[in-house]
Amino acid sequence: MTTKKADYIWFNGEMVRWEDAKVHVMSHALHYGTSVFEGIRCYDSHKGPVVFRHREHMQRLHDSAKIYRFPVSQSIDELMEACRDVIRKNNLTSAYIRPLIFVGDVGMGVNPPAGYSTDVIIAAFPWGAYLGAEALEQGIDAMVSSWNRAAPNTIPTAAKAGGNYLSSLLVGSEARRHGYQEGIALDVNGYISEGAGENLFEVKDGVLFTPPFTSSALPGITRDAIIKLAKELGIEVREQVLSRESLYLADEVFMSGTAAEITPVRSVDGIQVGEGRCGPVTKRIQQAFFGLFTGETEDKWGWLDQVNQ
């Protein structure tokens, strides 16, 4: 049983009704986690519906598939057009978009047979702020998880793979069991990696800090946008290893991601961060980010892909 969120899903080149988009219970991905995916947002902007950093997301999807040696029949351009098609077909002006490449019913065994193919779906549906609309203004309470991120030579962190998110499930569910809204994972060396499903930033003395990818963090596309926007605002940005206690001593902390957008963190492990609310640097970056969709921030990078162009 599923909750219907839209009317149609793009499935291997065809528009299929939401309730008819089904896979076999013996699909390889269900047993072995053999899938890669993306999370993308379509915003209702001053230019009409726009997909944010569309090409970069589809490039990362292709890159994730390449890392795991999954064959993909569709080009990046074909997947982008499929995204636009499913948004239009569902009459959406703002949406969360979920492209997914997975290994279907190709037989049992960890290694798929020679010459196998993958299945591809793209769903688009309305979805608000991941951690709650009020969290964007008021911030959230987070905790450092007892679960570390895997070392980069065990699970490739550059790939956005379905199986990787079991780690995120452990980090996030532990936080919620203890009354927090989100968890923060450390890397195998005890330094900050990222949130359960978000990249992480700190502000100290007006400087913006974020962990490097070598700390087992996903190369976030929203993270990259924030770094570019911050530099445009004249904010110094440093990518460096960060200790757990730096979270307690930071003036501001926030999480970023397609789903989370830019969510302030008001406390970590019960210790108030800064003033315990959305800080001034975070607010400036939020305004610059959301200003892309109102026209208040110039899109110098060509990040907005118009759905109806």
UniProtKB/Swiss-Prot annotation:
The modification N6-(pyridoxal phosphate)lysine is found at K160. Pathway: Amino-acid biosynthesis; L-isoleucine biosynthesis; L-isoleucine from 2-oxobutanoate: step 4/4; Amino-acid biosynthesis; L-leucine biosynthesis; L-leucine from 3-methyl-2-oxobutanoate: step 4/4; Amino-acid biosynthesis; L-valine biosynthesis; L-valine from pyruvate: step 4/4. NCBIfam families: ilvE_I, PRK06606.1. Acts on leucine, isoleucine and valine. This is Branched-chain-amino-acid aminotransferase. SUPFAM superfamilies: D-aminoacid aminotransferase-like PLP-dependent enzymes. CDD domains: BCAT_beta_family.
